[in-house]
Amino acid sequence: ERGYLLTVKLSRAYSNLAVLGDHGVHGTDGEVDEDLIRHAIDLLESVRTQGENDPYWNSRMGYSCLMAYRSAATAYEYAKCWLALAPDDPAAQKLVRDCEEYLEEEKALELDLKEREEIIRKETPDDVKGGICK
């Protein structure tokens, strides 16, 4: 039976393989192997009760979630836990800052999209609106 530490290290190996690829399979396209990253997260979930208060577990969960969901919201929660458990860790501080930047970018893109939709609504004649969206 695999212990806690081995499970977390195995998860890291799967996460690295998902992001970096196997001998350049992913090349430089930035794609993440979704099956492998999901498996990495599943491994971490299997030891959640032992890991929730472990800075390393939270770091691995934060990085893996950031890669898996391409959204910083979930990763940010784990990054904050990691930072709370290891406030002097520069890597934890960096992940928190990175997630905050990603969240700001997502928010700006969402606001930009809403503004564009509003402009289109205002500039589209009512008879065209009725013909497009019934």
Predicted regions and their residues:
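N-terminal alpha-helical interaction modules that lie
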Residues: 2-7, 117-133
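Canonical positions in the second alpha-helix
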Residues: 3, 46-47, 81-82
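Solenoid-repeat scaffolds in large eukaryotic assemblies
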Residues: 40, 75, 92, 108-112
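Amphipathic alpha-helical repeat scaffolds of TPR domains
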Residues: 2-27, 53-67, 94-101
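Alpha-helical linker/edge segments of TPR/alpha-solenoid repeat scaffolds
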Residues: 16-28, 70-72, 99-125
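Helix-turn-helix repeat elements of alpha-solenoid scaffolds
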Residues: 29-42, 69-73
